[in-house]
Amino acid sequence: MNFTHINEQGYARMVDVSSKNDSERIAIAQAIVKMQPETMGKIRDGAIKKGDVLGVAQIAGIMGAKQTSALIPMCHPLNLTSVNLEFAFDEVNASIIIEAEVKTTGKTGVEMEAITAVSVAALTIYDMSKAVDRWMEITDIKLLEKSGGKSGHLVRD
């Protein structure tokens, strides 16, 4: 079996993407943070003692996307052209739904950057809110959509 990230000597390597054509790459990822309804209310009302939870999570998610290649072995450093995070309150399930859309024009996709963005944003929500709710859950981290490159446009069912 040929592995893409292993060289002839059996050592790890970063895949050579230099022969690929540049194309617009977009990825959308999601994470969900489940919590007690009271915790969600405090976040919404700005009553968490550490400060503006979603404002800090927004910045953390952007920073996470920008640092993906430093965190994930063999991820190519990318020149991101856009990182946008959105947060939605799910009152029925006492959850915050995080979505990140990441864009670039380049030779490789931004799926890992989008997934890292929502993961870091979710961890930030947890960190800033854990004093009032230690049993929050970070769930459903997944890629929702991607476009660009050979695989074209894909959307999760």
From Swiss-Prot:
One annotated GO biological process: Mo-molybdopterin cofactor biosynthetic process
Record has Thylakoid as a keyword: no
The keyword Nucleotidyltransferase appears for this protein: no
Superkingdom of origin organism: Bacteria
Residues of the active site: 127
Keywords: Lyase, Molybdenum cofactor biosynthesis
Sections of the chain in a coiled coil: none
Name listed for the protein in its UniProt record: Cyclic pyranopterin monophosphate synthase
Species of the source: Syntrophomonas wolfei subsp. wolfei (strain DSM 2245B / Goettingen)
